[in-house]
């Protein structure tokens, strides 16, 4: 069993009967969703909000009952992955392009459970490029303003074409030369730029992290 599968399947044990949960996106959460599909067959009853079309399709294939955030007040738990996790449980997310919906769902949850393998643990955020979701209109001007914060930027592509999010936006991936020492401050500065929709910095949102290591599960 690989480390992503180890963490992902373990996280499924946190889902209890009657819960309303958020389901994240990515290669680690895939294993959680697969395991939850097995538990549904065994009689577990819960409802889920998907954070992407990709997750929605997988959940439907496994007969996991889906609901809309518009129909409920809050979620009991969201299970999601991360691209980087620092010692304060601040995150970089959005490598898969679903950061806006992931943040909306996470902020609607009483708890955010992050799952990852040990390679995602870092001292400081920023080795992994920070995704920033922007609107397409006048995107070059928005990118220029982002660059003024001291980073190198790349417009995200997929199959040699501009990557478009589930919300019909674009993503700028940002590399800061000296890592990100104050994620909250950077997030606030980015959000003040007109044209920026959301950032991949998840600050003070994580309740617990489940890390798959060579020695087993580590809870942070």
From Swiss-Prot:
Organism: Bacillus cereus (strain ATCC 10987 / NRS 248)
Superkingdom classification of source: Bacteria
Entry EC no(s): 5.3.1.6
NCBIfam families in the record: PRK00702.1, rpiA
Binding-site residues, substrate: 25-28, 80-83, 93-96, 120
Top EC class for this record: isomerase
Name assigned to this protein: Ribose-5-phosphate isomerase A
Family per record: Belongs to the ribose 5-phosphate isomerase family.
Cited InterPro entries: NagB/RpiA_transferase-like, Ribose5P_isomerase_typA_subgr, Ribose5P_isomerase_type_A
One Pfam short name: Rib_5-P_isom_A
Catalytic activity: aldehydo-D-ribose 5-phosphate = D-ribulose 5-phosphate
Function: Catalyzes the reversible conversion of ribose-5-phosphate to ribulose 5-phosphate.
GO cellular component annotations of the record: cytosol
Keyword Secreted attached: no
Residues the record marks as active site: 102 (proton acceptor)
Pathway noted in the entry: Carbohydrate degradation; pentose phosphate pathway; D-ribose 5-phosphate from D-ribulose 5-phosphate (non-oxidative stage): step 1/1
One GO-annotated biological process of the protein: pentose-phosphate shunt, non-oxidative branch
Subunit structure, interactors included: Homodimer.
Any one GO molecular-function label of the UniProt entry: ribose-5-phosphate isomerase activity
Keywords: Isomerase
